[in-house]
């Protein structure tokens, strides 16, 4: 099965982490899925992804001390595979796993995803639990010196032992039976562990064998640009940054990362800028103080514009059931979503500490887009010259009317190019028709 078939366009969806951390339950997943189906599905949003710790008993019980409990009791089946805890996912009882929840999400016209950690549970190794289809136990395929630096749940696997591949095969056979459409694998993308490179390939092989199209997302970043082709051969998304939050310095730094990764997107293969910290977030972290995103309105538009013109996946992090009207409007701009889904030839024209310019072509709309970003701390006038932007492929905007996406205004460029007055941390996104 061609892995790219399951993600011909950059995925769009929701991930539970930014609000719920390790604590989301089935009722909350269903509520967010129902909201997406009612308000976002028609615009292309489709994935509902449960992030980390859906298998951990007592998750969040000591959140003031630990994000991930040391020596936590993890729920497993007889073959060392993590399964949902029934106290948070009651429909998973009696061995049903995530199948009932996935069926419900599919009934809404959506797709279902889960988060996993690289490797196999340390608890399974300690208990010498069996590996399906082999004579080995979990301790025999695990590398006890290969532990994630920030999460204590798992051991990395030994690529030199064929049974390690069989363990991953058994995982994805289980996920396929559950009806999983998307898997985010953590502690793997930036290849901190010596086995991470090989384990990326093992995950891909397991998906190929499971006879179900499953999007594979690798985390956390920063991904290695030298591994770009390896990611593209084996995964659909790979994080180019560590966790992204609602901070202007992090957003400004994303321009550097996108510059590095421009030209690496193709159907089924997407450099990933991480989740969109919009709306209400942070409700289940240490201090339990949820917050409205710290990004200003202009910064939110800058983020959405950069993600979409670059062609990154869109994964919302908010508690969706409490989205305000302005955030919902931001997430349902059909023109911007078309650019994210269908855009081609995205390239950075220039970048300095104070400004950046990107362009891309959307064949679906037959439009060329020009995004001018003000990265400085004050309102500025920024000029772009025709010879910087127009190419023979895209045609010239000389003499054409330019339409501004965010305001709906029209402008005609001056003889030498385009001038725009842009607020601090803001953006003007122009387009012209190639008809």
Regions found by a protein language model. Give the residues of each.
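Mature N-terminal, pre-catalytic/accessory segment of carbohydrate-active enzymes
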Residues: 1-19, 23-25
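Structural recognition of the beta-strand scaffold that forms the well-ordered cores
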Residues: 11-16, 46-51, 111-116, 181-186, ...
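Active-site beta-loop-alpha junctions enriched in small/polar residues
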Residues: 17-19, 53-55, 117-121, 188-190, ...
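Aromatic-lined carbohydrate-binding/catalytic grooves of carbohydrate-active enzymes
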Residues: 37-176, 180-190
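Glycan-recognition surfaces
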Residues: 140-146, 158-160, 166, 170, ...
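Carbohydrate-binding surface patches
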Residues: 301, 307-310, 315-317, 351-393, ...
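Catalytic cores of secreted or luminal carbohydrate-active enzymes
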Residues: 302-350
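C-terminal beta-strand-rich structural cap/linker in extracellular carbohydrate-active enzymes
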Residues: 413-435
């Amino acid at each position: 099965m061609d892995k790219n078939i399951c993600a011909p366009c950059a995925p769009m969806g929701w991930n539970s982490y930014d609000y719920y951390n390790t604590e989301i339950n089935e009722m909350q997943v269903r509520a967010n899925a129902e909201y997406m189906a009612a308000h976002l599905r028609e615009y292309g949003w489709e994935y509902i992804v449960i992030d980390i710790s859906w298998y951990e008993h007592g998750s969040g019980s000591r959140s003031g001390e630990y994000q991930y409990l040391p020596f936590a009791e993890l729920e497993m089946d007889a073959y060392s595979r993590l399964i949902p805890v029934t106290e948070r996912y009651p429909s998973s009882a009696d061995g049903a796993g995530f199948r009932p929840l996935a069926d419900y999400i599919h009934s809404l016209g959506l797709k279902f995803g889960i988060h996993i950690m690289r490797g196999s549970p340390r608890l399974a190794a300690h208990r010498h639990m069996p590996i399906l289809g082999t004579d080995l136990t979990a301790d025999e395929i695990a590398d006890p010196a290969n532990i994630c630096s920030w999460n204590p749940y798992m051991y990395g696997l030994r690529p030199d032992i064929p049974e390690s591949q069989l363990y991953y095969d058994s995982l994805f056979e289980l996920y396929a039976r559950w009806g999983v459409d998307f898997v985010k694998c953590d502690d793997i993308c930036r290849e901190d562990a010596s086995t991470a490179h090989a384990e990326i390939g093992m995950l891909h092989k397991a998906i190929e064998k499971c006879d179900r199209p499953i999007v594979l997302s690798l985390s956390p970043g920063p991904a290695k640009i030298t591994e770009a082709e390896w990611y593209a051969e084996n995964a659909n998304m790979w994080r180019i940054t560590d966790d992204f939050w609602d901070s202007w310095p992090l957003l400004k730094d994303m321009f550097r990362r996108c510059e590095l990764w421009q030209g690496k997107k193709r159907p089924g293969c997407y450099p990933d800028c991480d989740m969109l910290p919009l709306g209400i977030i942070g409700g289940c972290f240490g201090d339990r103080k949820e917050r409205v995103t710290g990004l200003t309105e202009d910064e939110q538009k800058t983020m959405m514009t950069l993600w979409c013109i670059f062609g990154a996946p869109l994964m919302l992090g908010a508690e969706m059931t409490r989205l305000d009207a302005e955030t919902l409007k931001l997430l349902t701009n059909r023109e911007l979503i078309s650019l994210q889904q269908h855009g081609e030839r995205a390239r950075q024209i220039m970048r300095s500490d104070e400004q950046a310019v990107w362009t891309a072509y959307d064949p679906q709309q037959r439009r060329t887009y020009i995004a001018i970003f003000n990265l400085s701390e004050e309102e500025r006038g920024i000029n772009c010259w025709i010879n910087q932007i127009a190419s023979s492929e895209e045609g010239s905007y000389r003499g054409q009317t330019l339409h501004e996406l965010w305001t709906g205004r029209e402008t005609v460029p001056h003889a030498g190019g385009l001038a725009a007055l842009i607020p601090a941390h803001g953006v003007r996104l122009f387009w012209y028709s190639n008809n």
